């Protein structure tokens, strides 16, 4: 155990030092703060548990450093500390709750600018020097460059000694303009601002529109009791202070503080500058001193950090993928970025029309987001470094069959296409469908490539012990795969029906079928033998349109699909599912719901599952066809949209009885 712990500590220290250099020296970080913080916390945890392995060179005892050899190192007059940070609002509230305000609640809230930290030293009202934060003890002297920033006063009206902290930044608009002309574009405005500030020739720096907000002062050159008075004085002296800083006192509640944070989050995309969080500070300076400091941060301040909603990256290549329906989807392989809590190395480009509309090709710098915090997507071209736009090939990359266009998408029409076949098997085994544990995409692809399986039914006939001759497959693993296959035979009919991959047939439509007495294979098969009668019958079900009705009828007249159903029936799969709706649950049955907010004692997934079991149908977004929106605490934008569409609102109290 000890050697493993020592090795993990050594690996963490090596990795953190690498990231420190990338962030502070190179201005080219490869990971987001969220990831860095997790590794620091893990190292702190290990060093606390095994103090005998904590060394004097540990990153937990030091600060990151932006010191460069190109600039003179100068000692700060006092340690320049970092901020403690949280990524969870509950933890932020907990931090506020722990502060003893002595019946004098006082806190300031301001956006956390995503820029380059700077410390300004004024002597007798004259800017004497400007240092980077450096390692907290020493910083690089960038005075000559800082003097070119027009928003920093070189002389003050009063002969005072001040030490101020500020954040140098560049606006989103100027970032895009400047990045176009750089041989090696920066991935974000923070790195660009940092890079400009560290240019050796100050004449070059003067050509760039750097900006600054002053957010703190570190000495007693001006005597004030509270942060709001100090901020007002700084503004009067000519310093630029963020106008969004807001001060809360006894007249306010913690709820109002959290509401203001929510308002900043909501409006962040409209700001002219990038922010990566908000900063909360105790306003009363006497209380600040009582709360004190750690070696790393003041105890009277806390940063609530956001996970990035989007970021910029370069497109290295574009590939086309073939899905289970044969749909051809172009995908961009990009430089790794961290967005909404996850690393992204690829992003969907939707279809040929979309690529043409944004004019994208390999080599371009693009804006990447995670739509709905799930699917990575390229939103727009930021810098065009290529000519023309990417064109989807005329032939399927897997089977070379000529592709056909249906609407905005290209499709491979070959039902025997190997990519289509393997994607169908992956879908069949997926968590939302048959949920066959152990059958990862990698294992399914391996079985397919070795020609052990060609379709879903082969999973139930293959002798898995043949895998013993391959690396990575031992008795235990093979037995687990076999047990998972056997367990799948007990899944409800709704899961089997979903797993068959009938076009546009999802969980909600299946529930509608079941609620209308079409809850078995035999009933669906019998209905669909008379196509015209089936079509009119299905259209009478609210929520089923012409397209899905035709797809259902086609599927239950397709010989390949029917043979699969017969195969599973012979294996004694469940071919019928009873949906029992009693009088109490009639309100829910077949109705379309959406959910927003939090629910005391219940996760959203539990609420959804319990109501689904009683016949409710859930949508992920608010549309005009919705019957009810279930609203918990801290409801989001869905509530506003639902009200504008006159959709009925249900509270937690309205649904509580259905959750028992």
Swiss-Prot record:
Domain of life assignment: Bacteria
Co-factor requirement: Mg(2+); Mn(2+)
Binding site for Zn(2+): 396, 399, 412, 417
Domain BRCT: 583-660
GO molecular function: DNA binding; DNA ligase (NAD+) activity; metal ion binding
A Gene Ontology BP annotation from the UniProt entry: DNA replication
List of catalytic residues: 112
EC number(s) stated in the UniProt entry for this protein: 6.5.1.2
InterPro entries: BRCT_dom, BRCT_dom_sf, DNA_ligase, DNAligase_adenylation, DNAligase_N, Hlx-hairpin-Hlx_DNA-bd_motif, NA-bd_OB-fold, NAD_DNA_ligase_OB
Binding site for NAD(+): 33-37, 82-83, 110, 133, 167, 281, 305
UniProtKB keywords: DNA damage, DNA repair, DNA replication, Ligase, Magnesium, Manganese, Metal-binding, NAD, Zinc
PROSITE patterns: BRCT
Recorded catalytic activity of this chain's protein: NAD(+) + (deoxyribonucleotide)n-3'-hydroxyl + 5'-phospho-(deoxyribonucleotide)m = (deoxyribonucleotide)n+m + AMP + beta-nicotinamide D-nucleotide
Cross-referenced Gene3D superfamilies: 5' to 3' exonuclease, C-terminal subdomain, BRCT domain, DNA ligase/mRNA capping enzyme, Helix hairpin bin, Nucleic acid-binding proteins
HAMAP family: DNA_ligase_A (MF_01588)
Family: Belongs to the NAD-dependent DNA ligase family. LigA subfamily.
NCBIfam families in UniProt: dnlj, PRK07956.1, PRK14350.1
Function of the protein: DNA ligase that catalyzes the formation of phosphodiester linkages between 5'-phosphoryl and 3'-hydroxyl groups in double-stranded DNA using NAD as a coenzyme and as the energy source for the reaction. It is essential for DNA replication and repair of damaged DNA.
Name of protein: DNA ligase
């Amino acid at each position: 155990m000890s050697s493993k712990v020592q090795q993990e500590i050594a690996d963490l220290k090596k990795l953190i030092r690498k990231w420190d250099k990338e962030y502070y020296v190179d201005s080219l970080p490869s990971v987001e703060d969220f990831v860095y913080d997790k590794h620091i916390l893990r190292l702190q945890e290990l060093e606390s548990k095994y103090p005998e392995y904590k060394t004097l060179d540990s990153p937990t005892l030091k600060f990151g450093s932006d010191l460069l050899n190109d600039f003179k190192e100068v000692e700060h007059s006092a340690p320049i500390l970092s901020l403690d940070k949280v990524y969870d609002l509950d933890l932020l509230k907990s931090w506020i709750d722990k502060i003893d305000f002595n019946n004098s609640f006082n806190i300031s809230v301001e956006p956390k600018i995503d820029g380059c930290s700077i410390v300004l030293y004024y002597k007798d009202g004259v800017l004497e020097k400007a240092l980077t934060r450096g390692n907290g003890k020493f910083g690089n002297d960038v005075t000559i460059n800082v003097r070119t920033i027009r928003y920093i006063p070189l002389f003050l009206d009063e002969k005072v000694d001040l030490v101020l902290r500020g954040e140098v930044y560049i606006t989103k608009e100027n970032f895009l303009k400047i990045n176009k002309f750089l041989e090696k574009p920066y991935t974000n405005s923070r790195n660009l601002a940092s890079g400009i500030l560290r240019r050796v020739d100050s004449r070059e720096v003067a050509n760039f529109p750097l900006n600054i907000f002053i957010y703190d002062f570190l000495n007693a050159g001006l005597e004030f009791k509270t942060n709001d008075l100090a901020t007002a004085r700084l503004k009067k002296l000519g310093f630029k202070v963020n106008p969004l800083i807001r001060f809360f006192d006894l007249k306010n509640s913690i709820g109002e503080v959290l509401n203001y944070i929510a308002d900043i989050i909501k409006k962040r995309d409209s700001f002219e500058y990038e922010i990566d969080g908000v900063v909360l500070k105790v306003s009363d300076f006497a209380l600040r001193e009582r709360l004190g400091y750690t070696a790393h941060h003041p105890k009277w301040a806390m940063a609530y950090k956001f996970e990035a909603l989007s970021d910029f990256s370069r497109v290295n290549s574009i590939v086309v993928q073939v899905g289970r329906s044969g749909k051809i989807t172009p995908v961009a392989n990009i430089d790794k970025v961290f967005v909404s809590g996850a690393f992204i190395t690829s992003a969907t480009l939707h279809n040929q029309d979309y690529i043409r509309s944004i004019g994208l090709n390999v080599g371009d710098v693009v804006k990447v987001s995670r739509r709905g915090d799930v699917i990575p997507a390229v939103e727009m071209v930021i810098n065009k470094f290529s000519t023309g736009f990417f064109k989807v090939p005329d032939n399927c990359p897997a089977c070379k069959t000529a592709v056909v266009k249906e609407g905005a998408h290209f499709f491979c029409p070959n039902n025997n296409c190997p990519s289509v076949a393997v994607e169908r098997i992956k879908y069949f085994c997926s968590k939302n469908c048959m949920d066959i544990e152990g059958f990862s995409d990698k294992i399914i692809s391996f079985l397919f490539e070795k020609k052990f399986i060609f379709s879903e039914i082969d999973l139930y006939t293959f002798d898995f012990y043949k895998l013993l001759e391959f690396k990575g497959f031992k008795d235990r693993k093979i037995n687990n795969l076999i047990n998972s296959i056997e367990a799948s035979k007990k899944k409800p009919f709704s899961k089997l029906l979903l797993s068959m991959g009938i076009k546009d047939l999802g969980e909600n439509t299946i529930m509608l079928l079941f609620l209308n007495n079409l809850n078995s294979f035999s009933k669906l098969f019998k209905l669909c033998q008379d196509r015209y009668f089936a079509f009119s019958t299905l259209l009478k079900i609210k929520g089923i349109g012409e397209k899905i009705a035709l797809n259902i009828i086609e599927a239950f007249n397709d010989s390949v699909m029917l043979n699969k159903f017969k195969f599973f029936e012979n294996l004694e799969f469940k071919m019928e599912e009873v949906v029992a709706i009693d009088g109490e649950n009639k309100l829910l049955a077949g109705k379309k719901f959406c959910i927003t907010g939090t629910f005391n004692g219940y996760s959203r997934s539990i609420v959804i599952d319990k109501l689904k079991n009683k016949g409710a149908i859930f949508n992920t977004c608010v549309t005009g066809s919705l019957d009810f929106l279930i609203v918990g605490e801290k409801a989001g934008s869905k509530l506003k949209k639902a009200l504008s569409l006159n959709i009925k609102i249900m509270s937690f109290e309205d649904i509580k009885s259905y959750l028992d």
